[in-house]
Amino acid sequence: MKIINEIYDRTIEDEELKYLRNNTCLLDIETTGFSREINHIYMIGLARLENDKIKVTLLFADNRSEEKDILIEFINYSKDVNRFISFNGLSFDFPFIKSRMNHNGIEYNFMEYEHLDIYKECKKLKDILCLGNLKQKTFESFLGIEREDSFDGGELIHQYKLYEKCNDEECYHNLITHNLEDVQGMVELLIILRYLHITDNIDNSTISEITNTNGEIVAKITTDYNIPKRFVIKSGFYYILFEKNIIKTILKPNSCTLKYYFDNYKNYVHLLNEDIIIPKQLLNDNNKNNAVPCKKSNCCIDVEGLYLPVFDKMLFEDEKLFKENLSSKETYVDISSKLNDSLYLKKYIIHIIKYRLN
């Protein structure tokens, strides 16, 4: 068994420190396959904060018979750990370790620890950030993190078998480099968690630079929350760019005619000769013979306007909401009178952001 210690020589940001304090340990394992029953753990990568530096410790089994040795060393290492941080550790690493400990007759209780699984926390970012997959290297690539290592965990199985067979130095280098960069990469990845908190204080942001050109509304929202890399959310009705602490928005309302449906349709009648809807209490001797009770499907009026979709009806419950027809699930607001209303536009833009990001 080998124990490799490295100091990850970089400045630790405050955002990272809040995750790494209080005896927190980052963990990543390498295995000879995906079956907990028949495959082995050949390396456990660990890292923790020591004297404001990240100290990485790799527990490496020179052969499969040393699996028990690195598991026991891992227990010794983690005696004063309060929390683990991993990437997909709750689904892979920790169940694998538990199974292999059982196989080796070692008792250990992972339920005593807190766990932060970056993969689990960030799964929803795949679509938001337009990532091709949820691999650690894909998140690192989005953040601009570069690696020396070019292997994935599956390819390293063959490298480990070669190392077991003939102590190949190149294979050893590849194995150590991969796990080292996996563990170091998790430190770098902590910043990705910022994307989960963009909306936390967004209601206190400010809106400015509102312009209305060629039917599009352009606005800038300034927040107190910085993100490391820009990204975009968009649809046919909006384009929203997030860059550092600025949110640049283009709203694209649809100029068309939609229907407004009255509540309590039984309280309305349809005047056939005038083709209008009126409340029953407005009936009189002059028009009652031309009136028929409204149905739910026709108790509406057509309204021309500039429409944008609504994703949270409760937020706009004091406004008229419009639809294409009664069975339409989509509802819209008419912003014709709100084009220069900065507070309203801010409210509308933030409601889109919360819908897409939360």
Describe every region a protein language model picked out.
Residues 1-27, 32-39, 49-358:
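DEDD superfamily 3′-5′ metal-dependent exonuclease/proofreading module
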Residues 44-46:
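Short beta-strand scaffold segments in enzyme catalytic cores
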